[in-house]
Each structure stands twice: as C-alpha cells, then as structure tokens.
Design a protein with these regions (language model features):
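Short alpha-helix plus adjacent loop in nuclease-associated cores
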Residues: 137-157
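Conserved non-catalytic scaffold segment of RNase H-like nuclease domains
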Residues: 3-127, 131-134, 149, 161-175, ...
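Acidic, divalent-metal-coordinating active-site segment for phosphoryl/phosphodiester hydrolysis
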Residues: 180-191
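Generic recognition of well-ordered alpha-helical segments
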Residues: 143-146, 167, 191
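Acidic two-metal-ion nuclease catalytic site recognized across multiple nuclease folds
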Residues: 1-18, 170, 189-217
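Beta-strand segments within the central parallel beta-sheet cores of soluble alpha/beta enzyme folds
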Residues: 64, 136-139, 206-208
C-alpha cells in the first residue's frame, strides 16, 4: 500500500465527534471536474479543494490538480480541459494519493458531493487498494433544506433541484471561474460560510447536526 494511503488511514485514529463545535472542525470544500457522470466509465479531470476553519476560507490550505486522462475528455465547452492540457496532468493514482495526503481527516463539503466521492472511490478501486474515502461529508444542498425547514429562508421559494448557481445567487456570491474545480470549490466555500452563519442563528452549531442528510418529503 502506498505510504500516503497508509498515512491517510492512520488519520482516522480519532475522528470528529457529533458534538464537536463547528468552529473547531477542518472542513475541506471539494469539487471535481469529470469526463461524465459514471464512476465506472468516466474519469476525473481536475480536483479542487480549499479548507474552511473557524468561519474562514484558508487559501493557504488548498489543493488544485490536473489529471491525465486517456481518451475522451468529455464536454470541453463545459469544463475547459482539452486533451492537450489533460496530457500534462498527473497520473490518476498519483493525483489521488496527493489529494488524500492533503485531505487527511477533514470533513468533506460539496454541492451534491456524492458524485465527487463516488468518482474518487472508483479511482481508489482502480489503484488496487481496498481503501475508500472514510471522511464525513456535508452536502450544501442538504444543509440548505434543513435550514429552510428551520425557517431560515422565510419568503423565499427554493426550487426542488438546488444548483450551485441557485445558492450563489441566493447569497449574492459572484460565480467566478465557474465549472473549474478550484473555482467551484471556492464558490461553494463562500456559500458554505453563509450557510454556517444561518445555521448558528438556528442553533445548528455542532458537527453531527449540520452533517445530517435531508430527504425531501
């Protein structure tokens, strides 16, 4: 097993407890651009992430890597990664190892984060390791719906399908570098900070409470 993956496993000797105050948690806001939506058939093109700690975005604690993809890179007009550019990226296994070394036991935050996690897990499987992402996850869409139930968005009718653009517009976040992994991670981090402030007003101040999944009735 690569040393970086063994180090990643050891990071979970003590995991974040449900009663951990939110301001004590290292959140890692993650986004990836991919060739498509199938973890089996498609591949990760770029991984972008930035940490949020104690209500602040830590630009000095960030990650941005390009991956080499053999074959079809998918919709270039969406993600902007051309085959020539992808050829200059890291091999998948090396990029994932580097990301795990950065991630450690951080709580993963993302918008519809299940896609990114499943793509990374598929990459780990192709590496021949039995390790999968062990980190707690927080989906900004789920947190938004919980806060809506709390009455945080009184007078605002939220669409059934919450996009990142919807939340950015709701909170007045200007979406720079949209559809790049690092750009979308930063936009999501800004949205997440707004959500954390609303959560605090509604007594959602511990990790277990804000990480709850939401099932739309």
């Amino acid at each position: 097993m690569p040393p970086s993956i063994e180090t990643y496993k050891q990071a979970f000797a003590a995991t974040w407890r449900d009663d951990t105050p939110v301001d004590q948690v290292r959140f890692v806001v993650l986004d990836s651009e991919t060739t498509g939506f199938s973890p089996v058939l498609d591949r990760i093109l770029t991984i972008g992430a930035v940490a949020v700690v104690d209500g602040e975005i830590r630009l000095d604690d960030s990650f941005d890597e390009l991956l080499k993809v053999t074959g079809d890179v998918g919709p270039v007009d969406v993600h902007g990664v051309t085959p020539d550019r992808s050829d200059r990226g890291y091999e998948e296994g090396e990029a994932v190892e580097r990301f795990l070394a950065y991630l450690r036991d951080g709580v993963i935050v993302g918008h519809h984060i299940g896609h990114d996690v499943s793509m990374l897990d598929a990459a780990l499987e192709r590496m021949g390791t039995d390790v999968r992402l062990r980190n707690r996850t927080l989906d900004t869409a789920d947190l938004t719906w919980h806060l809506a139930q709390d009455g945080a968005f009184a007078g605002v009718k939220l669409p059934h399908h919450l996009t990142l653009d919807t939340l950015a517009d709701l909170f007045g976040v200007i979406p720079h570098d949209r559809h790049t992994a690092s750009g979308d991670a930063f936009i999501t981090a800004l949205v997440f900070l707004r959500l954390l402030k609303l959560a605090a007003r509604h007594n959602r101040t511990t990790l277990g409470v804000i990480c709850q999944e939401f099932v739309i009735p």
